[in-house]
């Protein structure tokens, strides 16, 4: 990996990112116990959100792994104009408030414009910057200024060391609570590849590193009018990433992904498969971190 020389300083007037970031009662730290970000691709309905959050809360409490619940009110980056995008902010944000109160769960959702950051922030614990927006300076600054924890997906077009500049835009805006997420790199047409060397490189930046096990198996635009995916490789990649050592894993899951209204059905893991996967990942994590 021909990594270019990167200056030691993050950026003028920038602070270093926090190496340990706490969201609710969940700790993300590259040296601490593995944490989980999980939930369905899209917010489908209040009832579905409650069903999923309840099931994941029960599972993670039993296993002893910290959970941040994720879901998206809008999926703006779709292959087709006619693709399902989600219920929208007006329907989803009040339910996010309910989920936080009912289940005592921190909630993560993604934002797609600068204006959305301040609107969404009061209703969630983590603002997520989508991969295709990871270089948008105004977007990163607007998110940072909300004071919320920021999770930035690494663009499929970025080298792992390029995330240093992304993180610097956030810390330089006064927010040191940043998570960085690896979700694969473009590899020719309609496919991604996960380079596990990216994980320690990103860890050198100083922020907790997350591995997105479900979007990493995505085949962008692979079905013509929508994206495909190879769900069978989710566990393979997740195990590899956790064996390297990460702060957390990101997994989209659903009771019936093949018949869901969500856009990432081919990538999502069936909810019934989550217990066995998490048990194995936690075992890998204990070995990787010598715990």
Which stretches of residues belong to each language-model region?
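Glycine-rich, proline-tolerant flexible connector loops at the mouths of alpha/beta enzymes
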Residues: 36, 40-49, 67-89, 254-264
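Catalytic alpha/beta core domains of metabolic enzymes, predominantly
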Residues: 146-253
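Catalytic beta/alpha-barrel core
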Residues: 87-88, 102-116, 125-138, 149-160, ...
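Short, well-ordered coil/turn segments that N-cap beta-strands
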Residues: 31-34, 63-67, 101-107, 123-125, ...
